[in-house]
Amino acid sequence: MKQSNLLFMSAAMMLASCGGTGGAEQNTALIGKSDIQIEGKRMTPEALWAMGRIGSVAVSPDEKQIAYSVAYYSVPENKSNNELFVMNTDGSNNRQITCDNWQESQPTWIKDGAKIALLCNETGSSQIWEMNPDGTARKQLTQYDGDIEGFSFSPDGKKLLFIAQVKTVQSTADKHPDLPKATGIIVTDLMYKHWDEWVTTAPHPFVADFDGNNISNIQDILDGEPYESPMKPWGGIEQLAWSPSSDKIAYTCRKKTGLAYAISTNSDIYIYDLATKKTENITEENKGYDTNPQYSPDGKYIAWQSMERDGYEADLNRLFIMDLETGEKRFVSRSFESNVDAFLWNKNSQSIYFIGVWHGETQIYNINLADNDRLTQLTDGMYDYASLALCGDKVIAKRHSMSMGDEIYAVNNVRNGDIFAEAKQLTSENKHIYDQLEMGKVEARWMKTTDGKQMLTWVIYPPQFDPNKKYPTLLFCEGGPQSPVSQFWSYRWNFQIMAANDYIIVAPNRRGLPGFGVEWNEAISGDYGGQCMKDYFTAIDEMSKEPFVDKDRLGCVGASFGGFSVYWLAGHHDKRFKAFIAHDGIFNMEMQYLETEEKWFANWDMGGAYWEKDNATAQRTFANSPHLFVDKWDTPILCIHGEKDFRILANQAMAAFDAAVMRGVPAELLIYPDENHWVLKPQNGILWQRTFFEWLDKWLKPAEK
């Protein structure tokens, strides 16, 4: 990666020159939209980090304006900054309404559209503020003692629901006040760590009165309970919902702690009555995940996402509705044999929009509840849609692909026969960067697997691809293990930056991925070293038949389950590959079973504990642990891991690296003391990309060195 190919004109820093009052720091240097200049029309790590990333999207009550947030990153400052924008719903008159160094997020229209509420940390903690739609007249609405992490005003505007952390675990200092400098942590049950934190608090939903200027009478809906709502690590305000009458709150909660929490996905939807303070569990009979409730606009129904089986986090995510008068429940997405990833009621309460993945694309669908739950696909094309908001006769959604990050689109909410709904792009946040880049072609290929099935494989070609040349080629191994290889855009595992470095990328939707029916999705559980690995070999072997693929310069890369795949393939690839890269991968399955914090996942996907000698599924899983095949390792390998990763501990990468070195296999180890399962800090991200390509180039482009 040559630094001379890219010039930072301002390193993602800009002098403020935007609308709105912007707070006290309006005239200081800010992290904002980059004016990066790129030479050579090839994607670079710096170009990726220069891109603005669109976040929350909200439509005004009169459906004339859209408010949204954008995160900007500075590599020199090694941090980000969130700003807010407002535009007309046709995309015109787009203007930035905040311009400061505070973190502003979650724009929400309140007071019939006269004001925008937002989260802002200007006073040192994250509080709720309001301002005019042009950014003027900023005013702080809450002075809560602690950070507010999400919020929602009641439909009548008289109450506020917000999320904040409460202490659930006594610290060592609490137990031993005479030892204030002691650093030891005393643990008595499981779930003491989760994702990337030592668990000492839980998010709780709070409700307060709101008089238009201040909040009062704050009440913790889970007062005295050690449970979390929303659920860690990723749950937000979408896991709670107001009733249209403003007198009830539906919330998602798994009312378990310790070992019971660690082995179960059994969350439920609870309805809290503000008048009686009573709570009702409406999903008690279901044993899997129940999440993300939404009341219908007419208040007659409530909808939510539901998985059937306890402990199976990748179970079919179904859409259910319940008649609030009769209690009757209905599985309304039955005709869609894939996951409902997000949903939204139509204003007439007669249909529901949702997004879901099918055949490697995440599209928008509609379920007509008044017509026997008839399913209609509204959008088409090589894209992934994300997030949904209604705007008159249109749906406002974010959309991305393997060739472009998120932008906001307006989609007609009707389909005319075989003609899919029209989508109009409303934002062009990174057009100034895309205009300087040439993207590689993305192609869909269907390949016949060893068991006679058809597998969708994405192939991404270098820009200015020449079929008369031979290219080094990378097999991409997806994580999850049940995450789709759809039209995703990543700021780390970005296929276009791999293609820009003159690699062909082969990305198969191997066994275990959603979007191809339940049977295909479930085929990986208990079979980590089985058909999914044969699918990988099918993909790379089929592509190796092409004259433009240099089968003597094949690499294999992946993260999480993809990292496990790399470690496993390193002992089974029969000299196909010349270089491996494993990020946050599982090397020793027995240790992973004990080390990972969400035990339900290990129990389900591994089939059980390794000490269950009569459990054939579990024994097959652990017999396929990559560490058992190190004696067959003969190919250079780069191991990457974050030490704050509590899903798969960093000692897995260290052990793999040590084993390779002791075996005499060329190896390199990249460890991040301050990153989790992902790499989130700008300079760490740049280092990741540079190390990634330096390693691949060393072994797959030796003639060029």
Question: Model regions: which residues?
Answer:
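Beta-strand-rich domains and repeat architectures in extracellular enzymes and scaffolds
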Residues: E46-N82
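Short, solvent-exposed loop/turn segments at conserved positions within beta-propeller repeat blades
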Residues: P76-N81, N121-S126, E197-T201, A260-S267, ...
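C-terminal motif of bacterial Sec signal peptides marking the signal peptidase cleavage site
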Residues: A16-S17
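Predominantly five- to eight-bladed beta-propeller fold
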Residues: E25-I31, N82, Q165-G224, T252-D268, ...
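Active-site-proximal cap/loop segments of hydrolase catalytic domains
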Residues: N494, A499, A507-K705
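Conserved beta-propeller blade repeats
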Residues: M51-I66, N101-A117, R138, D145-L160, ...
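Short loop/turn segments that connect beta-strands within beta-propeller blades
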Residues: N88-S92, N132-T136, F210-N213, D273-K277, ...
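Cap/lid segment of the alpha/beta-hydrolase catalytic domain
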Residues: T257, F420-A421, T427-D552, A559, ...
